[in-house]
Amino acid sequence: MAKKRVGIIFGGKSAEHEVSLQSAKNIVEAIDKDRFDVTLIGIDKQGQWHINEASNFLLNADNPALIELNKSNQGVALIPGKEDRQLVGTANQSVLDQLDVVFPIVHGTLGEDGSLQGMFRLANLPFVGSNVLGSAVSMDKDIAKRLLQGAGLHVASGLTFTRAAKETIDFESIADQLGLPLFIKPANQGSSVGVNKATTEAEFTAAIEEAFSYDHKVLIEAAIKGREIECAVLGNDYPKASTCGEILPQDGFYSYDAKYIDEDGAKLAIPADLPEDVNRRIQDIAIQAYKTLNCEGLARVDVFLTETGEVIINEVNTLPGFTKISMYPKLWEASGVSYQDLITTLIELAIERHERDKQLKSSVFDRN
């Protein structure tokens, strides 16, 4: 059987650029090379696309704090629509081999907010992960919370402010309404980028400024006392949930550094020490959230489990990390799915959806 040609796209103009590089490194190492030929396409911090070689596509690859994309002199142009000419190398105008599927591992803005997904659809490229709608609504924490609440699921109490309403933000009135401490976060970021905990007005003011430096919309949420539980979901029309895992932060909350820089920043309990009925209930809620937000392919659903047994959804991440300490692949490994098999399944799901969508009519006129 001929190998499938997989384009792994990584990097990007995002605060999560370095996380994406780590994820790409692990996927390249783990992918089944007997079944797939890989083309590496790195996006630098200026948004330029590069065709990279697997042997040297990263600098400082083993240092999460210093990891960099090794830029090439071979750029990429995309030709929408035609299945036999999708990507062109700009250095010598050579046509790259047609890709059978794309595996985007571009975290954060412009990567998992529907932007990249829309481009893949225009280019007629099958791709791993949620479609435009699922990606966009899941990325925007404000919109996601509204949809989840509408579906009867529990989310954290909070307020949303746009930049236009920034001057109306008042620490004392918000603290009276939501209590202390408060969590301040950009609406459209992941990996805890720009997220801060505030117990004083000075901390609050600094956190608001930082959050607005990442987005034009900011969430202010009440702190939730409970265990941080995560569940991985996999599938298109009939998604399945992994066993649950627990995050045990060592510095108060699961910050960016704890996730990706400081290997001692948090402990992971996989599987989580939960009664089986609670594990199943969280799995059911994770699948319900996944369907509510129109997710496909994969997502990680993060929840809080309170002392009273209430399950509160924190966020749904449609392109979770694939670093060596990331929860998503670890949860599936604990559920009996190896890292390599997980990558294979995700690629197969992408192709399956693309073939399904090709059956839809694109015209009201039935012409041969």
From Swiss-Prot:
A Pfam family it matches: Dala_Dala_lig_N
Reaction catalyzed: 2 D-alanine + ATP = D-alanyl-D-alanine + ADP + phosphate + H(+)
EC number: 6.3.2.4
Binding sites annotated in the UniProt record for ATP: 175-230
GO cellular component: cytosol
Assigned protein family: Belongs to the D-alanine--D-alanine ligase family.
UniProt function note: Cell wall formation.
Official protein name in the record: D-alanine--D-alanine ligase
Species the sequence originates in: Shouchella clausii (strain KSM-K16) (Alkalihalobacillus clausii)
High-level lineage: Bacteria, Bacillati, Bacillota, Bacilli, Bacillales
